[in-house]
Amino acid sequence: MQQTCKRKIWMQISVALVTSLWMISAQAELLIKVTEGRVDAVPIAVVPFDGAKNAEEDVSAIVQADLHRSGQFKPLPPQDMLSRPRNEQEMIYRDFKVLGTEYVITGSMKRQETGGYEVGYALFDVARQKKLMSETYRPPASQLRDVAHAISDRIYEQLTGIPGAFSTKILYVTHNRHDANPYQLQYADADGHRVTTILRSNEPIMSPTWSPDGRKIAYVSFEDQGRPGIYIHNLATTEREKVSSFSGINGAPDWSPDGQHLALTLSRDGNPEIYMLNLSTKVLTRLTNNYGIDTEPRWLPDGEHLVFTSSRSGGPQIYKLNINDKSVRRVSFQGGYNARSDVTPDGRYLVYVHRRNGNYNVGVQDLQRGTFNIVTRTDMDESPSVAPNGSMVIYGTQHGGAGVLEAVSIDGRVKVELPSKEGEVREPAWSPFL
């Protein structure tokens, strides 16, 4: 009787959480607004590329926006430039040095007879008066945005030592109450452009997550007469497969680093527990066995451990599980509520939602040093997801009662808003490198 009541309560809570998040309609591209950058952001100049005005996409403008959005760089407005060199021969270093600019990017876009473009760029160090790198791309016109993001990735890595994540995607769920199928699963470029709708449904969609190669996604859908099921969707072929539809809860899927397994939450035996599903053999392995609610599993990079949320100590806390011997130990001790964890690619930082003074914030725990820092100042944060380079965290929150996405650097020094043009967005998931 106790288990039955617990299962019913959990299901009611799950559905209530989803439906209460949707207040107004959502659709279209995400907007990008840097609300707080580093005080020591690096001054950089992206000179408008020669030939960009007549192109379908202005590659130089996209590169400038990417670098600005990272919060690590402070681009010089083009109107403030004393000169606009197109190449190394035209570079006048003193024109940028006097303005305090440390790096300069020049480039050109030349239309080819095939209809595509030759896009070249170069990066210069003003202090050393030296060219650091240069590259040339020959994309079709339809891939100019991809080239721009690739250039941003290369420059970001050259100057920070960290791979750029501008060519990645953001997966999220929206809701439009005026649509016959109001729930939508969508993804967009990391800068909010080129939105693609994967699924439309008249029932809630939850917990989207990427496969390690970025070719598939898994998610929870209530489309089967309101019952939750876990689906895998191939982005290239649009084929879908239902991989979990047991009685009770089917939730919180997460791909193993090798892409061979899904960790998930099931209540098929009466209590919400963590399971592992072999995607090839469909063999299901139970990993936890506790009277508390165990949910929200996330794989660690080594593929041998998971972190998950459990109520076994009273309130929700984060625990670490060894999948081989099934040993469990608690890893979060700050306050009475810690949930919805994610892990940086190097396994060093644990990111999760922490409750403090009635507010729900994103916190970052250093697993090596044991330190913990709250990195957001909003009060209804949920679903943090770490970028594949470990530098940023995207999460859902609320502004004026409406759901938006925001991103924050792992040290809390850079903050970016990604509100929808028309309404609510929830459940973000940052893609792997693509």
Curated annotation (Swiss-Prot):
Keywords: Cell cycle, Cell division, Periplasm, Signal. Residues 1-28 form the signal peptide. Pfam families: PD40, TolB_N. GO terms for biological process: cell division; protein import. Its main location: periplasm. GO terms for cellular component: periplasmic space. SUPFAM superfamilies: TolB, N-terminal domain, Tricorn protease N-terminal domain. It is found in: Periplasm. Belongs to the TolB family. HAMAP family: TolB. The Tol-Pal system is composed of five core proteins: the inner membrane proteins TolA, TolQ and TolR, the periplasmic protein TolB and the outer membrane protein Pal. They form a network linking the inner and outer membranes and the peptidoglycan layer. Part of the Tol-Pal system, which plays a role in outer membrane invagination during cell division and is important for maintaining outer membrane integrity. This is Tol-Pal system protein TolB. It comes from Alcanivorax borkumensis (strain ATCC 700651 / DSM 11573 / NCIMB 13689 / SK2).
